[in-house]
Regions:
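Catalytic cores of large soluble enzymes that bind and process phosphate-bearing ligands
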Residues: 13-14, 70, 183, 187, ...
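Active-site segments that bind and position negatively charged phosphate/pyrophosphate groups
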Residues: 201-249
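Acidic-aromatic/histidine active-site loop/patch
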Residues: 99
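DPxDG-like acidic metal-binding loop motif
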Residues: 103-115
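ATP/NTP phosphate-donor binding region
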Residues: 1-92
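A glycine/threonine-rich phosphate-anchoring loop and its flanking beta-alpha core
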Residues: 9, 113-207
Length: 249
């Protein structure tokens, strides 16, 4: 059976586009007695990015630690902290960081509208209720988490994603400027993550023309970045991450 693919519905790409986040939130998430939840990798807690967050006085900012892979217990903790913050659910959840930070944001947005523990939903299409409107903003390229329909979590018994159409971000902002400060070593490893995703996809059992087209383009971009020293490498690596994520989706 051919599946009906759910994709990110709105994509903003370009250097400096992060500064348009406030406009998007004003349109989608702002209202009387409403707040927005920001889940941001704690590596940015003392960085200039902190001052660029379009926070309002009623919003909740939580710095997330991703030194270890995201755990279901941590997702449940962040979900409860958000519920305790206000009598209402947030109008939006914003995930800013690498793949783990974005996975946490996706998982929390789901658990705010679904009962129980996030461990209950590890598997395929177990989520019953749509997530809170959520936005993903990658600050490093390679994982493809910004476009995937899964959020990979370590549970009490297994490491497995919450795989659901409701997991997919409603909006992503792909701003290559956010990756400029990434250390060369880390940039290489996440870039190779993208490259390996594409190799896996192109040799997969269920390969079709759709996945092949994205995988081949992502591989081409990865090679341009790593072999040619392209001056637009940040832009190309961000797009390789997007295409690679689409290929394995």
């Amino acid at each position: 059976m051919i599946k009906n693919l759910k994709n990110v519905s709105h994509i903003l790409f370009g250097r400096g586009c992060f500064d348009q986040l406030g406009e998007i939130l004003a349109e989608k998430c702002r209202g009387r007695d409403s707040f927005v939840l920001f889940l941001v990798d704690d590596v940015f807690s003392q960085s200039p990015l902190r001052e660029r967050l379009p926070l309002k006085t009623q919003d909740l900012l939580l710095w997330v630690n991703v030194d270890d892979e995201p755990k279901t217990a941590y997702v449940d903790e962040l979900t409860q902290r958000t519920k305790d913050f206000s009598g209402n659910l947030p109008r939006g959840v914003i995930g800013i960081g690498g793949g783990s930070a974005m996975d946490i944001a996706k998982a929390v947005s789901l658990m705010l509208t679904n009962p129980g523990s996030s461990a209950d939903y590890q598997g395929w299409d177990l989520v019953e209720n749509p997530a809170v409107y959520h936005i993903g903003i990658p600050t490093i390229a390679g994982t493809g988490a910004e476009v995937s329909r899964t959020t990979v979590l370590n549970g009490p018994q297994k490491k497995l994603g919450i795989n659901s159409n409701y997991t997919v971000f409603d909006q992503i902002l792909i701003d290559p400027e956010l990756t400029i400060s990434v250390a060369a070593e880390q940039r290489f490893y996440t870039g190779m993550d993208c490259y390996i995703h594409c190799v896996e996809s192109l040799h997969g059992t269920y390969l079709n023309a759709f996945a092949k087209s994205y995988g081949e383009k992502a591989l081409c971009l990865c090679r341009e970045v790593f072999l040619d020293g392209d001056p637009d490498s940040n832009d190309k690596m961000m797009m390789a991450s997007y295409f690679g994520g689409m290929s394995i989706t």
